[in-house]
A protein has these predicted regions:
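Positively charged, low-complexity intrinsically disordered leader regions
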Residues: 1-49
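N-terminal active-site beta-alpha-beta segment that forms phosphate/nucleotide-binding
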Residues: 50-99, 104-173
Length: 173
């Protein structure tokens, strides 16, 4: 799958925001970056929620950490029946989406997308954790491509010899 983070700065590459692999989610610790490059390793979806609460990931980072946490939750319950997996994932979705009050609305939306993807994957007999991870990459691609488009429009609005004094994610414009 083509990725919109190709050739972007370290801080924007998906693996350096939050990444599910081998039964854990690694989240770049933005509380100390760029002074140090360290990752917080979460081995349960509750630990992902705690990392979000504790501001390990910041700015748009929770919007990658939350669905990667859902992939981890799917991995945690992989041996259960389909109904039990969905029940487990619904509880995980609540825990993750309510980890930070300022991001709850959007994280609920993302967790709901993950629940739909889990239902689809279970019906198709696919690996639910991998399906949610791939959906997260797809969602990131959509967001990154949208922000690139917004950024290109914004650049055209700068006056000749203008100065940009601060930088934020384009979605805040």
């Amino acid at each position: 799958m083509e990725r919109a983070d190709k050739d972007l700065a370290f801080l924007l590459r998906y693996e350096n925001v939050a990444w599910f692999e081998d039964g854990e989610v690694r989240i770049l610790d933005r509380r100390i970056y760029p002074a140090k490059v360290e990752f917080v390793t979460c081995r349960t979806h509750q630990e992902v929620a705690r990392a979000i609460t504790d501001m390990v990931t910041q700015s748009a980072g929770p919007y990658t950490a939350a669905p990667m946490g859902m992939a981890l939750a799917a991995w945690e319950c992989r041996g259960k029946s389909a109904d039990e997996q969905m029940e487990y994932l619904k509880k995980a979705a609540y825990t993750i989406s309510h980890a930070r009050p300022t991001t709850q609305k959007r994280m609920t939306l993302l967790c709901d997308i993950c629940l739909k993807e889990a239902e689809r994957a279970l019906s198709a007999g696919e690996n639910v954790a991998e399906a949610i991870k791939n959906k997260t990459i797809e969602l990131n691609n959509v967001r990154y491509n949208r922000m690139a488009k917004i950024g290109s429009y914004l650049v055209d609005m700068f006056p000749d010899n203008g100065t940009v004094m601060t930088h934020c994610f384009a979605e805040t414009i």
